[in-house]
Amino acid sequence: MTKGTGGAGRSGGLDQAAVKTAYRRWAGVYDTGFGLVSRPGRRRAVALANRLPGERVLEVGVGTGLALPLYAPGKTVVGVDLSREMLLKARERVERERLTHVLGLFEMDAQAMAFADGSFDLAVAMFTASVVPDARALFAEMTRVVRPGGYLVFVNHFLAESGPRLWVERAMAPAARLLGWHPDFAREELADPAVAEPEIVEPCPPFGLFTLLAYRRPAAA
């Protein structure tokens, strides 16, 4: 399996300051740019979340709130994001579309969230894993705030294993700070396959560029 450059060894690696700077720049154009290409993956992730048991949903990396109108009646949603500018857009969407199922939107580091253990039935992270400085810390923190037996849902771009796309993604890696995400982010950087295996792995359009993953937190003994 092809591996990404990973963590501190990355060229042009992201830190919180770089993420905030990038999404301050992208906030005004995100919906009409990346928002369009990411729509199929976003819809599939929320459709899966809507089918999973439990009412309390945490959306990690809520961004401009593009997914918020898609949640089914009966789900309540709390969203977090590191970017104040993206959250402003999300709050405007909640008010404009009267999304009463959205209980709160908070500026928060997804790697160290201010929620008690087991606060949510499921956590959803769409196009977030390749943005945070430490994806393993993100995975661990999402696991912590989800109740035993609950689910973690991800949709994300992952590094190709071979072919021209792999070359392009590696060539783009030094631009991570400018882009606001890691083009060479490999799936094993999210979770150690020896420790956590997804129950669902589903390629998403366009052209299988994104992948939907679902992990179940083991039930309490």
Role assignments for model-derived ranges:
Residues T2-L52, L66-A67, K89, R93-E97, ...:
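Conserved class I S-adenosyl-L-methionine
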Residues G13, A17, F34-L36, V153-L212:
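C-terminal alpha-helical "lid/dimerization" subdomain adjacent to the S-adenosyl-L-methionine
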Residues L58-A112:
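Class I SAM-dependent methyltransferase SAM/SAH-binding core
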Residues L122-D134:
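A short SAM/SAH-binding and catalytic strip from SAM-dependent methyltransferases
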Residues R136-P148:
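A short glycine-rich, Lys/Arg-flanked "PGG" loop and its adjoining helix->strand segment in the class I
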Residues L213-A221:
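C-terminal lobe and adjacent flexible extensions of AdoMet/dcAdoMet transferase-like proteins
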